[in-house]
Structure formats: structure tokens, C-alpha cells
Amino acid sequence: MSGQHQITEQSSRNPLSRVSTLLPEKPLSPTSTYAGTQKHPEAPRQSSFLIQLQNIRNAIRKPMAEFFGVALLIIFGAGSACQVVLSTNPDVASSARGSFLSINFGWAIGIAMGVWVSGGISGGHINPAITIAMATYRGFPWRKVPSYILAQVLGGVVGAGLVYANYIHAIDIFEGGHHIRTQATASLFATYALPYMTQASCFFSEFLATAVLSMMVFALTDKRNHSPTNGLLPFALFILFVGLGASLGMETAYALNPARDFGPRLFLAMAGYGKALFNYRSQYWLWAPIIAPVLGAQAGGLLYDTFLNDGDNSPIKWRCASSQEHQLAEVV
């Protein structure tokens, strides 16, 4: 009895002994509780649902980066065009807000911001012509090209829609009425050539400017050349676009990017601008701001890889082999 009394007294003095009497003797199963009931059946479903959402996010993350990159490009570029042109109407603003150079800076800032947003995620193509050129010369997977281009075009649609919504009252005043929509304001979003330009001249202007753009993109991303660090690449593209706008931008409004023209043009069609968007100059929308930039980007990439690229990241391998033989000859 005295031994039993000592055990009872020690148990009463040790608080852990009381806690231990509350714990179950056997380990709990993952779906059981202390009361022996099941967990809420929705818990596994919620976990599975979150995993599915994460998988979807991972699958669309790169195309979404392209989407937001192009949307930003249009917001800055078309937004600057709207501000400069619409402000020339005295009923919209007391004085003009900018010049053609302001529009050049707007598009240049747009390309820089778009690449900063998307560059570390998707590569920052934000241009179907560049995406196709990267697939041709830099091993970008062709299976990803359709999703990138779709995202880029949709980004152009949404970006144009946001700018249009922001300036809709100024557009109404500029056009002279809510239901009046003409090329005068359509040209703030989509590209149109100057009246004296021939079809061949329009094509050549877009081809040339995009070839320069593509060659510079390949140079700026060539680690064997004096390429900037990844964080400074958008700034280099900013300088490039200011130069392109200042030198080759007047005649066709320098699309250089199928998504930059076709996306906003699709939005304008939905906004009531009519068939003239696509009938202009015998389907100008197709051969000038789409086909010419795609071919120009191919030409720029071909020229860079043929004459300047010395690496093994191009399908044009003979330049690399020739350079290695030359270096070996110098050593010997």
C-alpha cells in the first residue's frame, strides 16, 4: 500500500503523467482525430485542386509572360501616340502634348518594360517575328511557337483595349462623335503607310527595319560578343528602338512586330472600325506588318550567323569550324 501510495503521489506531482493519460496508446491514422472521427472529406480535394492550379500556372507561365510583355508594349506605345495626336485638338487639350519623338520614346519604353517583365521567364521575345527567328537559329522549340504567338497577339488585343478605354472620350471628341470611327484614330493603334509609299516600298521599309532589329537582338544576346548583362538588355533595346523610330519610323509607322499591329487591329475591328481595317491597300495588314517583319527577322538572323556569330548555337556551323581552324593555325 505504501508503494502504491508513493506511485500515486509521484504521479500527482509530475504534470507530464497527467498529459500522458490524455494521449492515445496507438498512433493516429492520417484521417483520424482524437475523437475517432474522420477529417473533412474536402481536405484531399482542396489539396488536389491547388496542385492542379499550380500545374496550370506552370504550363501557362511563359506564354503569360509574353502576353503581359506585349500588353505593356502597346500601353506605352499606343498610349503615347494617343496622347500626342489627340491633344492636337483644342477641345481635347489646351496645347499639344508631345511630338513624333515622344511617340518614339513611348514605343522604346514599351519594348524595354515588356522585356523586363518577361525576359527572365519566357526570354522576352514579345514579337512573333523574333520568336520564329529564335526557333530557326537558336533552337527555340517549334512546339512552343504557336502558344507564344497566340499569347503575343492576345496581349496586343488587351493592351489596345486598355488604351482605347482610357482615351475613349478624347477619341469621341477628336472624331466628332461617339459612333464615328475613322483611320485618323485607327492609326493610333495599328500601322498605316504614308500615301505616297508604293506597295514595294512599304514592304521593304518593314523588312529592312525588322532585319536590323533581329540582327541587333542576336548581337545583344550573343555571349561571345560584347553583349550586355541580362538586366541591361532592355535598356539596350530601348536605345535600339529610339534609333529605329528616329531613322526608319516615318513611312510605315514601323510595326516590326506582327503582334504589335495585328493585335490592336483585331481590337479595332471589335470596337466598330469596320472592314476598312483589312481592306486598306489590298490587305496591307497581312503583307506589310506581318509577312515583311517575319522575313526581315529571318534575314537579320541569317546575316548575323553567317558573318558574325562564332559560336555553336546556330545551324550555320561552318563559321564556327572555320574560326577554330584559324585559332589552331595561329597557335601552331
Curated annotation (Swiss-Prot):
This is Aquaporin Lacbi1:317173. A motif (NPA 2) lies at residues 257-259. The keyword Lipid metabolism does not apply. Keywords: Membrane, Repeat, Transmembrane, Transmembrane helix, Transport. Aquaporins contain two tandem repeats each containing three membrane-spanning domains and a pore-forming loop with the signature motif Asn-Pro-Ala (NPA). One of its GO terms (molecular function) is glycerol channel activity. GO terms for cellular component: plasma membrane. NCBIfam families: MIP (TIGR00861). A motif (NPA 1) lies at residues 127-129. It catalyses: H2O(in) = H2O(out); NH4(+)(in) = NH4(+)(out). Residues 1-20 have a biased composition (Polar residues). InterPro entries: Aquaporin-like, MIP, MIP/Aquaporin, MIP_CS. The chain crosses the membrane at residues 67-87, 101-121, 145-165, 200-220, 231-251, 284-304.
